[in-house]
Amino acid sequence: EYYAGKYNIDPLILYSFIRTESNFNPNAQSNVGARGLMQITEETFDWIKLKIAPSEDLTFDDLYDPETNIRFGTYFVSYCLLRYHDDLATAAAAYHSGWGTVDNLLSQAEYSSDGETLDHYPYPQMRLYVRKITNSYQRYQDIYNEK
């Protein structure tokens, strides 16, 4: 929740990403080598490190540390949300498939009516991922708003 506050993100959004990416397993590793709670790839780790921790002696293996992983993952989610105008679904698509893919889709009227948010997802894996994130977020909102 510290990093949610630091980057001004609803913590429930972060829970949704962590649940979807690793089911809260800090030692998770994907078949493409993404690591930790928020399943960050080495390329993404290197990019984020330049942005938020250039002088820190961190390695890709440090992503197995929950605090480091959440710190880096939260920055990445916040960047995606900022880039895509706080639209969670489009930001989730970018987190999953990359900005290049999403930016390309945004330029096509069949996928985006406004050029800023995605209306449709052409790839089944992207569509499933976005649905998992948005459904998890809705469930967390329902649970925590009942209290």
Language model region names:
Residues 1-147:
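Catalytic glycan-binding domains that act on GlcNAc-containing polysaccharides
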